[in-house]
Amino acid sequence: MSRIGKRPITIPNKVTVNIDGSHVAVKGPKGELQRTLPTLVIVEQDEGVLRVVRQDDSRTARQRHGLCRTLVSNMVEGVSKGFEKRLEIQGVGYRAAAQGSKLTLNVGYSKPVEMDMPSGIGVAVEKNTEITITGIDKEIVGNVAAKIRAVRPPEPYKGKGIRYKGEVVRRKAGKTGKK
């Protein structure tokens, strides 16, 4: 029983949803998203509400039920509000700079690391150490944030590196030298 899959999705004003078989297109003030959903799941629309219904009670259909409901819900939320991920850089001399759709990271390597952002993704840098990634597709925003963090993940001894805002890094005690 998928409790997530049973919950209806309310469609906000200014958002239109077109359903063509297993293909769902959502259009809103921030942009347009399209996705082809897996089989065994049907999306139904009536009076400002979307419902995701599975075709049978097979194990695969039950697995995909909650997944598809969340995917469609994220599409609706993305085109109406958008998504954002925040990262922070810690370390002496570590900094970031954004120019257009290009992000430059100086994080302790011999040369700066330059990253191009995919289309539809905005990047902003505040105070040289806080990076904000915005976009309408939650999956792409999360992947871009993970790739930026992977350039220099936080290390457990001094805590230097790139981390998500609010992420707690487990610290380790250094080795004790013998005297």
Curated annotation (Swiss-Prot):
Pfam families: Ribosomal_L6 (PF00347). InterPro entries: Ribosomal_uL6-like (IPR000702), Ribosomal_uL6-like_a/b-dom_sf (IPR036789), Ribosomal_uL6_a/b-dom (IPR020040), Ribosomal_uL6_bac-type (IPR019906), Ribosomal_uL6_CS (IPR002358). PROSITE patterns: RIBOSOMAL_L6_1 (PS00525). Keywords: Ribonucleoprotein, Ribosomal protein, RNA-binding, rRNA-binding. One of its GO terms (biological process) is cytoplasmic translation. GO terms for cellular component: cytosolic large ribosomal subunit. It comes from the Bacteria. One of its GO terms (molecular function) is rRNA binding. Belongs to the universal ribosomal protein uL6 family. This protein binds to the 23S rRNA, and is important in its secondary structure. It is located near the subunit interface in the base of the L7/L12 stalk, and near the tRNA binding site of the peptidyltransferase center. PANTHER family: 60S/50S RIBOSOMAL PROTEIN L6/L9 (PTHR11655), LARGE RIBOSOMAL SUBUNIT PROTEIN UL6M (PTHR11655:SF14). Part of the 50S ribosomal subunit. This is Large ribosomal subunit protein uL6. It comes from Gloeothece citriformis (strain PCC 7424) (Cyanothece sp. (strain PCC 7424)).
